[in-house]
């Protein structure tokens, strides 16, 4: 039984790595269907986005429109059972509007913790904690402490 869990866990980890590489880094938007369940529950979806796969596609479009050179690096990945946790490094240049912020032309880097719960080979539940404050400071929207 532990072999089955290990294989499933390893498959889920590989799926998260492939998701960031294919969908975001290679801009293969159609590949999102392979990774996200149509009814995925996203606990940290951006305001105004739909749920499920449609919402994930909206979020993808929002990020790639605002940051056309967006790149994710999976720095660490841990899995147990049906959950995968990835520690991410994110970088990009804001060339489009982002959550009501006009383009700044500034390059920014951020970190994020991404958690997915898998069933049937797809993410059915998602959480994302990103350093949004640091991102907004780098874009010049919020002053950094001491400025």
List where the protein language model places each region.
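C-terminal and inter-domain tail/linker signature
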Residues: 1-147
């Amino acid at each position: 039984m532990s072999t089955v869990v290990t294989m499933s866990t390893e498959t889920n980890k590989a799926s998260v790595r492939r998701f960031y590489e294919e969908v975001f880094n290679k801009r293969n938007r159609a590949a999102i269907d392979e990774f996200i369940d149509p009814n995925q529950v996203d606990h940290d979806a951006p305001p105004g986005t739909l749920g499920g796969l449609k919402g994930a596609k909206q979020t993808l479009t929002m990020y790639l429109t605002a940051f056309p050179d967006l790149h994710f690096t999976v720095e660490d990945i841990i899995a147990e059972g049906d959950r995968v946790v990835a520690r991410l490094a994110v970088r990009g240049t804001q060339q489009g509007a982002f959550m009501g912020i006009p383009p700044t032309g500034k390059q920014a880097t951020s970190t994020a913790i991404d958690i997915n719960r898998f069933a049937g080979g797809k993410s059915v539940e998602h959480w994302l904690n990103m350093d949004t404050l640091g991102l907004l400071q780098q874009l010049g929207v919020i002053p950094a402490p001491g400025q």
